[in-house]
Amino acid sequence: MINIAIDAMGGDFGEKPIIEGVLKALETKPFNAILVGNSKILKPLIPKKLEQYIQYEEASEIFSMNGNATDALKNKETTIYKAINLLKEKKVDAVVSAGHSGASMSLATLKLGRLKGISRPAIATLMPNIVNKTLLLDVGANTDCKAENLFQFAIMGEVYAREIMQIQKPRLALLSNGEEECKGNELTKESHQLMKKIPNFIGNAEGRDIFNGEIDVLVCDGFDGNVILKACEGVATAIFQLLKNEVKQSFISKIGALLMKPSFKKLKKHTDWQEYGGAPLLGVNGCVIISHGKSDSRAIKNAIFQAINFSQSHINKFIENELGKYNA
């Protein structure tokens, strides 16, 4: 059975939504949950029927969301430090944390190490498109990148799309300000030349192409990726709020909205980041799923499912093998 360490107290809303997410996941799939935190607080939240799947790793501190990621290695009593350490010692198969993302990245990179051939790890996230989903990476691990970093991100993204998303030949693109090969800054142009070695590389793509269903993996540096991610979250929230405002304007609008309610629910589910759970940190020697600090129980549940799928896929070995083809 898969063993997953869960940073049980690291999110913005404390332990309650995290534990609720763990319990929801256990009701669907059996796994061993190692809850990292204060067991005196956590134990009363666990129903007797699920106690057999729960273990505890004591941690007396929570890494502050206002803390500096560079201090993560010094604070050995924090929940995220203890969780990553369990993975390093191979006592668990994966870690899920909604705590400080910078601390999670820093600890995972320094304590677990990087995969062979990877110079920097990347955070990958799923974005909704009109057909299914687009994998976007990096979305925050590296604000400044070299062309070789983006090439490695491309390989990791392609393998993830193939092994986890079950896309046999994922269409891979590079984010730029135009589709033409000559477009972009020096980093984009240099990265484009490297990515031409990859058979599934289809060239440059613009920001709008994330949503048209014509690409499966989009590669960029962590600065651009994070801006895109946050902008999309804001746009989605604004659109639904505008719809709500318009519906209230007339009786006919309210009737129309009532008739459209099933469609609106499907649309909201498709565009809701909570449905995707968390973002895998690709390139480290282990499975670390980074969840949004504001994750509710549904997001935590889905992040756990991501961790299970990742752990069962042996994706890290596939990434190393794929990179080996180009480094030989």
From Swiss-Prot:
* E.C. number: 2.3.1.274
Q: Name one GO cellular component term.
A: cytoplasm
> What Gene3D superfamilies does the database record attribute to this sequence?
Isopropylmalate Dehydrogenase
Q: Which UniProt keywords apply?
A: Cytoplasm, Lipid biosynthesis, Lipid metabolism, Phospholipid biosynthesis, Phospholipid metabolism, Transferase
Q: Where in the cell is it found?
A: Cytoplasm
- The protein's annotated pathway: Lipid metabolism; phospholipid metabolism
Biological process terms in GO annotation: fatty acid biosynthetic process; phospholipid biosynthetic process
Keyword Lipoprotein (UniProt): no
GO MF annotations for this entry?
Answer: phosphate:acyl-[acyl carrier protein] acyltransferase activity
Keyword Lipid biosynthesis listed? The answer is: yes
- Tell me what reaction this enzyme catalyses: a fatty acyl-[ACP] + phosphate = an acyl phosphate + holo-[ACP]
Family recorded in the similarity comment: Belongs to the PlsX family.
What does the record give as the function of this protein?
A: Catalyzes the reversible formation of acyl-phosphate (acyl-PO(4)) from acyl-[acyl-carrier-protein] (acyl-ACP). This enzyme utilizes acyl-ACP as fatty acyl donor, but not acyl-CoA.
Q: How does it assemble?
A: Homodimer. Probably interacts with PlsY.
Query: What is the name listed in the Swiss-Prot or TrEMBL entry for this protein?
Result: Phosphate acyltransferase
Organism, scientific name: Campylobacter jejuni subsp. jejuni serotype O:2 (strain ATCC 700819 / NCTC 11168)
- Give the encoding gene's name: plsX
